[in-house]
Swiss-Prot record:
Subcellular location field: Cytoplasm
Protein name: S-adenosylmethionine:tRNA ribosyltransferase-isomerase
Record flagged with keyword S-adenosyl-L-methionine: yes
Gene (UniProt): queA
One Pfam family here: Queuosine_synth
Class in the EC hierarchy, top level: transferase
């Protein structure tokens, strides 16, 4: 299967560059796979799509301050976007500007060194005074996606974070749940839907396009995840009794499907941690999730391919066409899709 099959024209005016005026005031396109149907609704009606006994799974990872401006000794400005959070000596970062191996950058009293350039627009950096994560957390800003083509503003500090974000570590938000409000979550629970949290720290692959021509050539990025014991137990229990597991976002989907062998083991009742490197595309057989809430994704992206694997290529193609014709808003701050 070729990557070009997942290309489409996304007009720039269809990209939501700011969040909606009120959290949760977005639209929702609804795909029913069994009926091969598409209907149009609003995000605030999500609870009406759920059933008593469903299990809603959320990603509680919190976006860290991952964007930093550094300068070359000559004065040139370099924008850096941290791509992974760990306590090691070196970290990967996206960069805007011109860099070569050995270049030194200055940022808030620290000196950074370009140790390697492992991919287009990606640098491996070291820091002379502290670990890079601490430097970014102290002086960085919200890492809104590069395709928004603007600097982060005050509104992004609140709105590029979910209302239940808890554990710091992501360099991008789990965007499917950006429009979930406390009020909507209460309506969902009141309907008899159980809600559990997992953690997957969103990292490198969110910003890097697929450069290969075929799926087989693509090397998927790794993202750390943790499924607490209580959540793992409820997921396994839901599958055992035939209940629906509803994944809020592709990050939740990747974590659950990667952990499927342990979650489906009837003798297993512990937390699950790992590094999800699973590449989900059409032909994949889902073992855990039964419904998916997600956003409209960029062309040729791995998350678009995951969505196509779950919805079916043709149904998803029709849904995207209808969404474009009806002026839906796309990408992180945009409208959403519910697939059952």
């Amino acid at each position: 299967m070729r990557v070009e099959e997942f290309d489409y024209t996304l007009p720039e005016e269809r990209i939501a560059t700011y969040p909606p005026a009120e959290r949760g005031s977005t639209r929702l396109i609804v795909l029913d796979r069994a009926a091969d149907s598409i209907t149009h609704s609003v995000y605030a009606s999500l609870h009406e799509r759920l059933r008593p006994g469903d299990l809603l799974v959320l990603n509680n990872s919190k976006v860290i301050r991952a964007r930093l401006i550094a300068n070359k000794p000559t004065g040139g400005r370099i924008e850096l976007m941290l791509l992974e959070k760990h306590e090691g000596v070196q970290n990967l970062a996206l960069y805007r500007g011109r860099l070569k191996v050995g270049d030194r950058l200055l940022a808030h009293g620290a000196e950074l060194t370009v140790e390697a350039l492992p991919d287009h627009g990606v640098a491996r950096l070291s820091c002379d005074t502290a670990n890079l994560t601490e430097l970014f957390e102290a002086h960085g800003s919200v890492p809104i996606p590069p395709y928004l083509k603007r600097d982060a503003e005050e509104v992004d500090r609140e709105r590029y974070q979910t209302v239940f974000a808890e554990l710091p570590g992501s360099v991008a938000a789990p965007t499917a749940s950006l429009n979930l409000t406390d009020e909507l979550l209460e309506k969902i629970k009141a309907k008899g839907v159980d809600v559990v949290h997992i953690t997957l720290h969103v990292g490198l692959g969110t910003f890097l396009p697929i450069r290969s021509e075929t799926f087989e050539e693509h090397v998927m990025h790794r993202e750390f995840y943790n499924i607490p014991e209580s959540s793992a137990h409820k997921i396994g229990e839901a599958k055992a009794r035939g209940g629906r597991v509803v994944a809020v976002g592709t990050t939740v989907t990747r974590a659950l499907e990667h952990a499927a062998p342990r979650l489906l083991d009837s003798d297993f009742s512990q937390e699950v941690s790992g590094e999800a490197d699973i590449f989900i595309y059409p032909g994949y057989e889902f073992r855990i999730i039964d419904a998916l809430l997600t956003n409209f994704h960029a062309p040729r992206s791995t998350v678009l391919m995951l969505t196509a694997a779950f919805a079916g290529k043709e149904l998803l193609r029709r849904a995207y066409q209808e969404a474009l014709e009806r002026d839906y808003r796309f990408l992180s701050y945009g409208d959403s899709m519910f697939i059952s």
